[in-house]
């Protein structure tokens, strides 16, 4: 493709990738491509296949939609390579060395490992090109639930009880007593509820741990936290202001086959609804917003994040942070900001401009 209008900011939208969240990334990218202001931005689509090949991306967002429970996937097309040379920053070349396109900023719409975990952020840092969203350290810490919780605890933020299982370790009797039942068993570095199980009987724990280890050799076992699930978006403006969205309360999350907010419940079954703003007392809403911003700052995030909570009888408890939250048509992050007065197109504009401003300073 040619960069026909140099007056426009050229945004390379990366999507797909090697993680189990490949298809969710595709749907997010389709929505972003459809909503980037064509008067201001020229989109350079870059797909990454499930086996890691970088290819010319899909420019038609309609081909990146969820249709009849069928999730899209990056197809093998002409391969391209990103330049890591600062003298040729933002360039993508075909295998024969000819130029595909030159980007001014990278929008890595990659969920999960090999994208949201600091790897892509570090790669593009080598070429000194602006990247939307948090940097290497924030992305890596936010992806790993163990280190997320450790940083939150160090900041005095409210977290639940958990045990980390490494190197084929199993829960001890003392750890089982600490956690109680039920527990949630998760890959330590994963998202979209992939590989997660709810365990109500200890005899079911080994199978749940084996499932989680299919996605990550490190597993986290968490006590159940009783209370509604509430999410809050965080957005950083180019001038440095950090704002929290109105929070959303999720309804129907327990209606998944596993009794929790699993992948099918999130994306396929259409049983979850959200109330925005969450029907909570004003002081609880303000506390959720404050904790979301504190979490964002504790991980030294930039640009954006979504912070998830359980609101218990004793107040909000942090669950996790997503440093590249979903941007699908049903994703909470854009919905929460739309309810807060920041539409999808404006939201993307703020994120791209924040990345450009950060790079210039």
UniProtKB/Swiss-Prot annotation:
GO terms for molecular function: ATP binding; D-alanine-D-alanine ligase activity; metal ion binding. Residues 149-353 form the ATP-grasp domain. ATP binds at residues 176-231. Its EC number is 6.3.2.4. It catalyses: 2 D-alanine + ATP = D-alanyl-D-alanine + ADP + phosphate + H(+). Its cofactor is Mg(2+); Mn(2+). Its main location: cytoplasm. This is D-alanine--D-alanine ligase.
